[in-house]
Amino acid sequence: MIQDNFFPLFPHKHLLAIKDLSVQDLNTLLDRAEANVILSNKIDKTKSILRGRTQINLFFEASTRTQSSFELAGKRLGADVISVAIGNSSVKKGETLFDTAATLNAMKPDILVFRHSSAGAAALLAQKVDCCVINAGDGAHEHPTQALLDALTIKRAKGRIEGLTVAICGDILHSRVARSNILSLNALGARVRAVAPSTLLPTEINHMSVEVFNTMKDGLKDADVIMMLRLQHERMTGSFIPSTREYFHYFGLHKENLTYAKNNCIILHPGPINRGVEIASDIADGPQSMIRTQVEMGIAVRMAVMEALLDSRLKINGEKK
């Protein structure tokens, strides 16, 4: 296995957004994650870099995949992991986010994994605490670890990212996953497409370095990678589609639409899946689907992020392990 000392220094205290990272930063995290994938195939999947360290998961939005992935990543690195149940917390009694942050900061954690429905909340929190903050999703803004695990999934399946055509399809307007992936994939040399009805595209889409398509036939033509996104009804305040049935016919991924892409294309989805809305069950469970692989890569990536942040903190501040 590659030793931590062989990786370039990750020059950040927090991981808040893909837009903050250079190409070298992205590749450093992906290389670290590759080493963790190798580790995950061994009987002993653990490391000790976070032994004696505390990781707090603070999720203001419901999560199964992401929170469980961070919990397992921290435990595999030897951390003491605490997940705060917001439903039973002081937040429900009227405590503000910043008061909660001050309380947690007084406990002197080393890593705070944070998810919130408001864009920019993670960056604000990072200003109020002394520990490393990892953004696990802030509103429709960014979800950096999802973009990293998607990049790792693509790289391992295709052997590269540069030069590939990646079609991101669905509710791009409300998707933090889309925004982070557009940034990371462009930086890593992919050709990125946004495929959606005009009602589900952000107004700034023409300034996001993507090709825009309003039909699956045109958007999926010769695609190497298809990334499907769910309709985020919880962020919608009006009617964006006529019906889910019509949406699936025109913008869902089913056998007919899949024929427009390359025969060896791979299919990604960040989850949760709405079968029969944005993707057919036989496609989600088919041989081209990388959905389960994404879950596996998520643990490796989140381990890599925590390793890199702590390694940076130790070297920059001269702290002892």
Swiss-Prot record:
One of its GO terms (cellular component) is cytosol. Its EC number is 2.1.3.2. InterPro entries: Asp/Orn_carbamoyltranf_P-bd, Asp/Orn_carbamoylTrfase, Asp/Orn_carbamoylTrfase_sf, Asp_carbamoyltransf, Asp_carbamoyltransf_Asp/Orn-bd. Pathway: Pyrimidine metabolism; UMP biosynthesis via de novo pathway; (S)-dihydroorotate from bicarbonate: step 2/3. Keywords: Pyrimidine biosynthesis, Transferase. It catalyses: carbamoyl phosphate + L-aspartate = N-carbamoyl-L-aspartate + phosphate + H(+). Catalyzes the condensation of carbamoyl phosphate and aspartate to form carbamoyl aspartate and inorganic phosphate, the committed step in the de novo pyrimidine nucleotide biosynthesis pathway. PANTHER family: ASPARTATE CARBAMOYLTRANSFERASE, ORNITHINE CARBAMOYLTRANSFERASE, MITOCHONDRIAL. This is Aspartate carbamoyltransferase catalytic subunit. It comes from Bartonella tribocorum (strain CIP 105476 / IBS 506). The gene is pyrB.
